Amino acid sequence: MTNQTQENGLTAETVLQILREQPNLFQEYQIKTMALFGSTARNQATSTSDLDFLVEFQVDPTLGLYMGLKLFLEQLFQRNVDLVIQSDIKPQIRTNIIQEAIDVA
């Protein structure tokens, strides 16, 4: 972990800790699995980096469920969030995302 990451961006450890302190997150948004990936997972985030999450829902997500989770996370972290539904990952990038993903729960 670099000083730049500590000063300018959230670390993976911080993001995971904050999420794990949300006791009803998985139940409320019907989440089966959730993982952090991207620059924050690699501890290369800056103050302008978004957060990337790989998510699998327990049910087929409605737009309301998807957007509800996205907005909740954006408010929680005060930054843009990209939610990627696991079944929608393009095969060309699936391996890279899965390899760097860090499970939330």
PLM segments and residue spans:
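Helical scaffold of the NTase/Pol beta-like nucleotidyltransferase catalytic core
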Residues: 1-34
